[in-house]
């Protein structure tokens, strides 16, 4: 409890089954003023870009999965992009004093969330 200055989580959040419990656990182990930095992928907010992104990632991820003989894993990655609601909605329900979410990358499908305890 209150043990860590910062917690960093990159590209695994879509695989966490109970994100509310995970947010609470990270909050518990962070020192006061500590930061939880979360980097992951989602679908774009813009409806048109979301359609383009879905088509593009379907083709690209299934192609890469086929070439690398990891079709199951890349199919999961494609499906996982739709599993959670938009991070601006999903991550705003927590005990942290400050939350900043910034979208980066082409189509804004990568997001960076910084939570402060």
Task: Report the location of each language-model feature.
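Conserved hydrophobic/aromatic "anchor" residues
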Residues: 4, 96-97
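C-terminal alpha-helical "lid/dimerization" subdomain adjacent to the S-adenosyl-L-methionine
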Residues: 39-93, 102-103, 111
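Conserved Rossmann-like nucleotide-binding pocket used by diverse enzymes
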Residues: 8, 37
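A short glycine-rich, Lys/Arg-flanked "PGG" loop and its adjoining helix->strand segment in the class I
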Residues: 20-35
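C-terminal beta-strand of the catalytic ATP-binding
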Residues: 115-117
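A short acidic, Gly/Pro-enriched loop at the edge of an enzyme's catalytic core
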Residues: 1-7
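Short catalytic micro-motifs in class I SAM-dependent methyltransferases
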Residues: 11-12
